[in-house]
Amino acid sequence: MDNFLALTLSGTTPRVRQGKGAGFRWRWLSHGLLELTPDAPVDRALILSAGIHGNETAPVEMLDKLLSALYSGSLTLTWRVLVVLGNPQALAAGIRYCHSDMNRMFGGRWQSFAESDETRRARELELSLDTFFSSGQARVRWHLDLHTAIRGSHHLRFGVLPQRDRPWETDFLAWLGAAGLEALVFHQAPGGTFTHFSSEHFGALSCTLELGKALPFRQNDLTQFNVTSQALSALLSGVETSTSFSPPLRYRVVSQITRHSDKFALYMDAQTLNFTAFAKGTLLAEEGDKRVTVTHDVEYVLFPNPSVACGLRAGLMLERLP
């Protein structure tokens, strides 16, 4: 199964659906779903996902290189792994999504959207995670969902962590720093993301990794993510990652800007970078007689997008943590 990406993009079902790799067994489950199981017993399970948005190709290419290293035997596998290429049709078309944003649908929220390829895929991925986690007795469960951002950022690589009732484990946060993440953003409320679903329903330590900017296939400079690729390789093979890194800055979400109607106006232009700072009192958005302003001394914007569909998030406002 050294052509997993090509099969996924072409929508082709492989003639052989399971086999042996270098020290592991592989099993093709469905388009964009591949299970890897080490020959030796392990108590760690990992979801490695990318391509939830079809125009975010750099992480997909990174995963393809990791799979090639595993199949060649140059990388040892020490986790049970479910590799997920989230939205095959959008990936093949080179678009963010075909009908609706899948990363708003998880946790059963797909039932609130008009039926589409994305709603069916979200349901399939939920069932796939349930089967994967329930078929083993993993003591450690991680989910790393790899993305790229629509626009540029003051932090080239950053992580977004779902709301979680329990404290985050220090080794997980340390690994995120070793993977080159310059900032970590902590959600304070539930959401429909893939990582919130895996965290809430399966207790996984989950993070959305934002790696650079969305570009088409074969136009990505993967060298700018070498530190992340090296950390992923070390993780898969059970090797300790470097401790010589600067701890990521930490932010938490303090509010969400939501577009409710065509009267919505977001006062940020296309050049506004993620993590741009705004002073207290700054007018951020208006919709009819409703005004959205900065309420803390300083707030930072994340994912500003004035053109989202009505009812969806047009941006998050953050505050820095000590």
From Swiss-Prot:
Give the E.C. number(s): 3.5.1.96
Known function = Transforms N(2)-succinylglutamate into succinate and glutamate.
Q: Which SUPFAM superfamilies does this chain map to?
A: Zn-dependent exopeptidases (SSF53187)
Q: In which pathway does it act?
A: Amino-acid degradation; L-arginine degradation via AST pathway; L-glutamate and succinate from L-arginine: step 5/5
Please list the residues that bind Zn(2+). H53, E56, H147
The Gene Ontology biological process annotation of the record reads: arginine catabolic process to glutamate; arginine catabolic process to succinate
What name does the UniProt record give this protein? Succinylglutamate desuccinylase
Q: Cofactor(s) for this protein?
A: Zn(2+)
Keywords from the UniProt entry:
Arginine metabolism, Hydrolase, Metal-binding, Zinc
Its family remark reads:
Belongs to the AspA/AstE family. Succinylglutamate desuccinylase subfamily.
**Reactions catalysed, as given in the entry:** N-succinyl-L-glutamate + H2O = L-glutamate + succinate
Q: Which residues form the active site?
A: E210
Q: Which GO terms describe its molecular function?
A: hydrolase activity, acting on ester bonds; succinylglutamate desuccinylase activity; zinc ion binding
> Taxonomically, which superkingdom?
Bacteria
Free-text remark on how the cofactor is bound? Binds 1 zinc ion per subunit.
